[in-house]
Amino acid sequence: METIVVKIEEGQQNALQNKLKPYQISQNNPHVAFAARYKAVTCLLYRSGKLVLQGNLASQIAQELGFQTEEKTDKIKLGQNYPLIGSDEVGNGSYFGGLAVVASFVKPEDHDYLKQLGVDDSKSLTDHKIRQIAPLLEEKIPHKSLLLTPQKYNTLVGKGKAYNAVSVKVALHNQAIFLLLQQKVIPERIIIDAFTSHSNYLKHLKTEKNQFTEAITLIEKAESQFLAVAVSSIIARNLFLENLDNLSNELGYQLPSGAGSKSDQVASQLLEAYGMKALEYSAKIHFANTQKAIALAKRKD
């Protein structure tokens, strides 16, 4: 999927609205003067005169409407000097622990405060630093946090189940953003740290009940480019760590983050101590670590 942005004059705006009137859709963003869904392309006309076209046929529709495209969002570095929602997830690459997804709403006036806290790509911050600043961010920044526990994850994700490893993330990001928008925040753009293509995201999105009309943009390594995504990454990391701590305390074993050999070893110990039910409660069963742990446990017999 591509996103096209063009600047149009007032006369062109009126003509555009008349042409797309039969395809008009409702939207709650006061910055958007008109919204339509035309030939599977979302058309958002902002009061500033900016027209955003998003969909697989965005370039074709822009030409059909008589506009010369000025820029594609996948070829430019977007600024962040406007209100935006950023969304990120943590835990998808870890065998133990749940899957945390957070969407955050950040305004330009928040930037100085966030920089003073040292907000950056959470992957470059220590867990100790994340545990320190996450509560401050949760108090200051409007956000929505979702945690899919391993036990719930295993009922939803896997062969023959409702979701796969990608579609479950689409569902969680969509729900977090949807719920944050219910708090009456008004973003000019919604950025998701890319974990799949736009087209694949939209394909999985079709099955979700809760929908919103605001356009989304998936950008790789967005947490290092947008403070809103960095905030979400930090809050999500803290939520994941708290879940991992709680599971470790309940089971009496220190559960590692990640999906390396250490996870295999701890999983085999859990199998010996409690059986498969311990992994179903604390880990993502469809990971290859499960079979490796079973093999390790058998060698010890």
Curated annotation (Swiss-Prot):
Q: What class of enzyme is it?
A: hydrolase
Q: Which GO terms describe its cellular component?
A: cytoplasm; ribonuclease H2 complex
GO terms assigned for molecular function: magnesium ion binding; RNA binding; RNA-DNA hybrid ribonuclease activity
State the UniProt keywords alphabetically. Cytoplasm, Endonuclease, Hydrolase, Magnesium, Metal-binding, Nuclease
Q: What is its EC number?
A: 3.1.26.4
* CDD domains, per database record: RNase_HII_bacteria_HIII_like (cd06590), RNAse_HIII_N (cd14796)
This enzyme catalyses:
Endonucleolytic cleavage to 5'-phosphomonoester
Task: Say yes or no: keyword RNA-binding present.
Answer: no
UniProt main location, coarse: cytoplasm
User: What subcellular compartments does it reside in?
Assistant: Cytoplasm
Sites binding a divalent metal cation sit at: 88-89, 193
Taxonomically, the superkingdom here is Bacteria
For this chain's record, the cofactor binding note is: Manganese or magnesium. Binds 1 divalent metal ion per monomer in the absence of substrate. May bind a second metal ion after substrate binding.
Q: Which cofactor does it need?
A: Mn(2+); Mg(2+)
Gene3D superfamilies the UniProt entry points to: Ribonuclease H-like superfamily/Ribonuclease H (3.30.420.10), TATA-Binding Protein (3.30.310.10)
| Role noted for this protein | Endonuclease that specifically degrades the RNA of RNA-DNA hybrids.
Identify the HAMAP family for this entry: RNase_HIII (MF_00053)
Output this protein's name. Ribonuclease HIII
Organism, per UniProt?
Streptococcus uberis (strain ATCC BAA-854 / 0140J)
